Amino acid sequence: MRNTMRHFAVAISLMLAMTLPSFSQQHPIVEKDYVAYLFTYFTGNHISEEAVCYAVSMDGYTYWALNDGKPVLDSKVISSTGSVRDPHILRSQDGHTFYMVVTDMVSDNGWDSNRAMVLLKSNDLVNWTHSIINMQKRYKGQEKLKRVWAPQTVFDPEAGKYMVYWSMQYAGGADIIYYAYANDDFTDLIGEPKPLFIPENKKSCIDGDIVYKDGVFHLFYKTEGHGNGIKVATPRS
C-alpha cells in the first residue's frame, strides 16, 4: 500500500507539472494551460465503496483510475459518519488551490440518516485539510432536517466568493437546493443557508451542478420521484 500511494503521489505531481508549467502565485492559470482532466468519484452504496477515488483522462472521455482504483483519502478520518459520497473538486480562481466538498454519509444507515457535509482544501490534490459542517450542530432550528446531499462549489464573480450549494430535505417537504458562501479559509459557511432553486412544481430536485457558459449560469439538476430525469434552469435576469 505504501508503494501504491507513492506511485499515486508521483502521478498527481506529474499531472500538476503538466497543468502548471512554471507559473507563480502571481500568474493565474488559464484554460489553455490544462492538458488533463481529473475525475473524482465514489463506487457504490456500501461503506467500503463510499470513499474518494481519482481517475485521469487526456481527452475527457477515456479515464484510468489512479492508486489502483483504491480510495485516495480515508473516509473515517475526514468524516463524522465513516463514509463520504458525491465528491466534487473545483480549482480556485488563482489556479493553485483546490476545493473539494463531499456528502458525509453511510447510505447503509438509510437515505435520511445524514446531516453533514465536509469541506476540504489542498494545494497538491494529495494532502487535504478538512472541516465537517453538521447542519443541525452549526445552525439552530434544524430539528426537522432529514438529509444533506451532494454539495458542490462554484465561484461567484459578483460576490468574489466561493458558493457551496447542496440539496436538503426537511420532514414533510421536498428536496430543495440550498446555498451558502464559504469563508476565506474554506473551513466554514458564512450565514444561514438559503434556497437557491425550487422547481415551479415545488417537487424535489437534487444533485445540482452549475456551469458558467457565455455569460450565463446553467443549473443542471435531477428530479426525484416525479418524472425522473436531468433538467436545466437558467436565471430569469
State what each model feature region is:
Residues 1-5:
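N-terminal secretory signal peptides that target proteins for export/translocation
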Residues 9-21:
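Bacterial N-terminal signal peptides
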